[in-house]
């Protein structure tokens, strides 16, 4: 009986390993499980008998891989993973991915039924204390198949081809090496290396069309930090007017007055900093910069300098 329990526990552990990474060699699995390669092969067969499609490939880069089957087998979740899954499903119900809300609620109800009372109370506490703001009416939701295609391509280092429409309505075809998906809550972005432009790009998923994984893979190149790169891109380059401003206050103090992702900062000595931000109109930038609460000067462009001057004249007239 003890041996049966040990074998069952090992098979469960093996399944957890296969779910955690795309490919494992037999030697790696044997080392992690503390058994021989022969035992690993027997346990793989047990998983297949239970309906888990475990694929095996030989040669360089080969190994065992958990594939997609005709039916969806059970997933193994530890307590922390179960709570994380429930929280993510609640957020997805009001998120920016098209058609996911109802499916997320159905999945959440199934998870809630089998969750221990202790974990259920943790999830309920998070839900009761959290309010989710949905996407704006002007935001376009991302299709789930686009999101999944890009996520798999990032994971597997697979080339992607896609149509793309930029801010001005120009349509181009892109050949990409996808690296990372970044979400701001309202929108999804892909940081990728553009093979034709030979440079990194930040692309909005809702502006992509006909997204396809080509089936060919690439070798990962040194990449910038995805969150920082996309943050810089969406704070300025997506707007027709981009301004640089010197604030006469330390960078850490000024940065606290800007919402995340709306500007980039660089120190300009111990008591000043340079801020770069963008907007649809110069007047928006003038008003925004003035409400930060610190003295500043606009370095560029001329349109924003003029807008700040006009706003200053208007405010002076208002207090006569």
Curated annotation (Swiss-Prot):
Record-annotated WYL domain positions: 139-218
DNA-binding region per Swiss-Prot/TrEMBL record: 24-43
Xref: Gene3D superfamilies: Winged helix-like DNA-binding domain superfamily/Winged helix DNA-binding domain
Domain HTH deoR-type stretches: 7-65
SUPFAM superfamilies for this protein: Winged helix' DNA-binding domain
Top-level taxon of the source organism: Bacteria
PROSITE patterns, per the entry: HTH_DEOR_2, WYL
Subunit structure: Homodimer.
Other known facts: May be part of a putative operon containing two genes of the DinB/YfiT-like putative metalloenzymes superfamily, MSMEG_1357 and MSMEG_1356.
Protein task: Transcriptional activator. Acts as a transcriptional activator of the MSMEG_1357-56 operon upon genotoxic stress. Controls adjacent genes that belong to the DinB/YfiT-like putative metalloenzymes superfamily by upregulating their expression in response to various genotoxic stress conditions, including exposure to H(2)O(2) or the natural antibiotic zeocin, as well as mitomycin C (MMC), diamide and UVC radiation. Upon genotoxic stress, upregulates two genes encoding proteins of the DinB/YfiT-like putative metalloenzymes superfamily, MSMEG_1357 and MSMEG_1356.
Name this protein carries in UniProt: Stress-involved WYL domain-containing regulator
Lineage of producing organism: Bacteria, Bacillati, Actinomycetota, Actinomycetes, Mycobacteriales
């Amino acid at each position: 009986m003890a041996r049966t329990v040990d074998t069952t526990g090992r098979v469960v552990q093996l399944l957890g390993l296969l779910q955690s990474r795309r490919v494992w060699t037999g030697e790696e699995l044997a080392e992690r499980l503390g058994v021989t390669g022969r035992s690993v092969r027997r346990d793989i067969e047990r998983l297949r008998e239970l309906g888990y499609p475990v694929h095996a490939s030989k040669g360089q880069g080969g190994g065992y891989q958990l594939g997609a089957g005709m039916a969806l087998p059970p997933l193994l979740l530890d307590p922390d993973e179960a709570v994380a899954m429930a929280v993510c499903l609640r957020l997805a119900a009001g998120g920016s991915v098209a058609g996911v809300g109802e499916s997320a609620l159905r999945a959440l109800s199934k998870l809630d039924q089998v969750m221990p009372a202790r974990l259920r109370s943790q999830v309920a506490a998070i839900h009761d204390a959290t309010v989710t703001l949905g996407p704006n009416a002007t935001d376009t939701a991302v299709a789930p198949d686009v999101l999944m295609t890009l996520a798999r391509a990032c994971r597997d280092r697979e080339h992607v081809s896609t149509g793309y429409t930029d801010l001005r309505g120009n349509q181009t075809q892109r050949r990409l090496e996808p690296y990372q998906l970044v979400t701001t809550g309202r929108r999804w972005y892909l940081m990728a290396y553009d093979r034709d432009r030979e440079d990194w790009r930040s692309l909005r998923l809702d502006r992509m069309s006909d997204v396809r994984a080509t089936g060919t893979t690439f070798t990962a190149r040194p990449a910038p930090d995805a969150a920082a790169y996309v943050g810089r891109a969406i704070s300025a380059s997506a707007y027709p007017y981009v301004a640089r401003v010197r604030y006469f206050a330390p960078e850490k103090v000024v940065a606290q007055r800007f919402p995340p992702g709306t500007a980039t900062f660089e120190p300009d000595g111990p008591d000043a900093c340079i801020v770069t931000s963008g907007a649809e109109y110069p007047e928006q930038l003038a008003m925004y910069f003035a409400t930060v609460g610190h003295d500043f000067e606009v370095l560029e462009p001329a349109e924003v300098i003029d807008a700040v001057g006009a706003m200053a004249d208007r405010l002076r007239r208002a207090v006569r």
